[in-house]
Structures are given as structure tokens and as C-alpha cells.
């Protein structure tokens, strides 16, 4: 799983995930499923905010290429991925500037158009179940919740999905691709079932102990890259941007 994560996610995302885990005393090399989950969540948060701006009239607009003459402001403030101290500093600054209620838990994003914090969820289970868990934890109607699943389902507070359909479809496609790539490597079942993953980890560690004294041979050959899926609703410009933003997965 660790190899998969490092091959299939942008190095910046991998680095942020490693820092987040180490901040809580967790090891990405051991808790590989959590490593994959954090990288996935980070990527969804970044994709959520991609291309979305507010123009000089205060209207939301989608811009795929930078125009130096345009007076644009990022629609979303990304809070997820920052260390806790900096994240709370950003949250406090937003609250002081906008007057919105300070959340009890760190949210993932702030939407300057709707003036609300957003909690993003990515689940391997039923979206309804995960949504209720998030809502019960946050216990605030001020924070907007948006849940995505690896099966293409989604659920949001009051069925308000914030983004346009194409932007959400882009996120769903990426999640589906991650699922398919995990499945092709035999990683999906253990990712969905953490208990099975722990059992496999113990088995692997035991095997490493038994083989510790044996000579090893490492292959440095690089396998062909797998082409990124290009769904029919993506035009060539958007696809080019995505190709530049995300690394291609490699087959084993």
C-alpha cells in the first residue's frame, strides 16, 4: 500500500500526509491504510477548491488558466493539510474577518461565497452512515458537510452540493480510479476492512522476521505508466490541467 500511495499521489500531498501522521505520532510505513486515506482526503479537498474563484462582483466563477488582468479571489480557503497551530490561526482570522461562528473542530475548507466552513468526508462505507457520524461529532448547523464515496455516491447538508456537477464528477472519477487501481493490486479489500489489514500486517512482519537473514535482490526497473482515465465530460484543457496536477499511477 505504501508503494501505491507514493506512486499514485502528488509528492506534495504525500509529504503533507506524512507530516500530519507524524504530528499525531503515527507511522506511514506501518499504518499504510490510514496513509492512503489521508492522501485521498487531501486530494479531494484540493480538487474541491481547484479552478473556483470569486470575481470583482462577488460572483462565483470557474477559471482554468490564470488571467493576470482578472480581479479574482480564491473561493475556498484550504485549512486541511496545515499543522494544527497554523490551521487554527487561519480559522480565527476568518472568524474575526467575517463574523462567522468559530467551529469546535478544525474544518477542511472555508467557502467565501457562502460564508461557511466545510467539512469534507471520503468514505469506504455508506454515505448516509458516515454523514451521520460527522454530523453527530460536529454538532453544528453552521458547518456544511459534504461526503463522497468511492462508489460515486455523495451526500451534503440540505442537499446543497456547493459545486457544479462537472467539478463534483471530476472528484468522483478520481475516487473511482483510486479504487480500481487498489483493486488491481489486491489492496482494496484490506483498505475497506481494517481488521483484515491488521491481520495481514502481523503476517507480513512475521515473514520479515523469518527472512531477515536471507540475501535480497532489489529490482530498479520502472514499469510502464498507466494512463489516467479521461471521462467524456472533461474537455482537453481540463484534462491537461489534471495531468499536470497529478502523477500517473504505475502498475506493479
Swiss-Prot record:
Family: Belongs to the influenza viruses PA-X family.
Function: Plays a major role in the shutoff of the host protein expression by cleaving mRNAs probably via an endonuclease activity. This host shutoff allows the virus to escape from the host antiviral response. Hijacks host RNA splicing machinery to selectively target host RNAs containing introns for destruction. This may explain the preferential degradation of RNAs that have undergone co- or post-transcriptional processing.
Broad class of the protein's primary localization: host cell
Stored InterPro entries: PA/PA-X (IPR001009), PA/PA-X_sf (IPR038372)
Lineage of origin: Viruses, Riboviria, Orthornavirae, Negarnaviricota, Polyploviricotina
Protein name: Protein PA-X
Written domain comment of the UniProt record: The probable endonuclease active site in the N-terminus and the basic amino acid cluster in the C-terminus are important for the shutoff activity. The C-terminus acts as a nuclear localization signal. The C-terminus is recruited to host protein complexes involved in nuclear Pol II RNA processing.
GO MF terms, alphabetically ordered: RNA binding
GO BP terms in the entry: viral RNA genome replication; viral translational frameshifting
Keywords associated with the record: Decay of host mRNAs by virus, Eukaryotic host gene expression shutoff by virus, Host cytoplasm, Host gene expression shutoff by virus, Host mRNA suppression by virus, Host nucleus, Host-virus interaction
Any matching Pfam family: Flu_PA
Catalytic residues identified in the record: 80, 108
Site positions for Important for efficient shutoff activity: 202-203, 206
Record keyword tRNA processing present: no
Organism per entry: Influenza A virus (strain A/Silky Chicken/Hong Kong/SF189/2001 H5N1 genotype A)
Protein location: Host cytoplasm; Host nucleus
Amino acid at each position: 500500500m505504501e508503494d501505491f500511495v507514493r506512486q499514485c499521489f502528488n509528492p506534495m500531498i504525500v509529504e503533507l500526509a506524512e507530516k500530519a501522521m507524524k504530528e499525531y505520532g503515527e507511522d506511514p510505513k506501518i499504518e499504510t491504510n490510514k496513509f492512503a486515506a489521508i492522501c485521498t482526503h487531501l486530494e479531494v479537498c484540493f480538487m474541491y477548491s481547484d479552478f473556483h474563484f470569486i470575481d470583482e462582483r462577488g460572483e462565483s466563477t470557474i477559471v482554468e488558466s490564470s488571467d493576470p488582468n482578472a480581479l479574482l479571489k480564491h473561493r475556498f480557503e484550504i485549512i486541511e493539510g496545515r499543522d494544527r497551530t497554523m490551521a487554527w490561526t487561519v480559522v480565527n482570522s476568518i472568524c474575526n474577518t467575517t463574523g462567522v461562528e468559530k467551529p469546535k473542530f478544525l474544518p477542511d475548507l472555508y467557502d467565501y461565497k457562502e460564508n461557511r466552513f466545510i467539512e469534507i468526508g471520503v468514505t469506504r462505507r455508506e454515505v448516509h452512515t458516515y454523514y451521520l457520524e460527522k454530523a453527530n461529532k460536529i454538532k453544528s448547523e453552521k458547518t456544511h458537510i459534504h461526503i463522497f464515496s468511492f462508489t460515486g455516491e455523495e451526500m451534503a447538508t440540505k442537499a446543497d452540493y456547493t459545486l457544479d456537477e462537472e467539478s463534483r464528477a471530476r472528484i468522483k472519477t478520481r475516487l473511482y480510479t483510486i479504487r480500481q487501481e487498489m483493486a488491481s493490486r489486491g489492496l482494496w479489500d484490506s483498505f475497506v476492512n481494517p481488521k483484515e489489514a491488521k491481520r495481514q500486517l502481523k503476517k507480513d512482519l512475521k515473514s520479515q522476521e523469518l527472512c531477515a537473514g536471507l540475501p535480497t535482490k532489489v529490482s530498479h526497473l520502472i514499469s510502464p505508466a498507466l494512463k489516467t482515465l479521461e471521462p467524456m465530460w472533461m474537455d482537453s484543457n481540463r484534462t491537461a490541467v489534471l495531468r499536470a496536477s497529478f502523477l500517473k499511477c504505475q502498475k506493479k
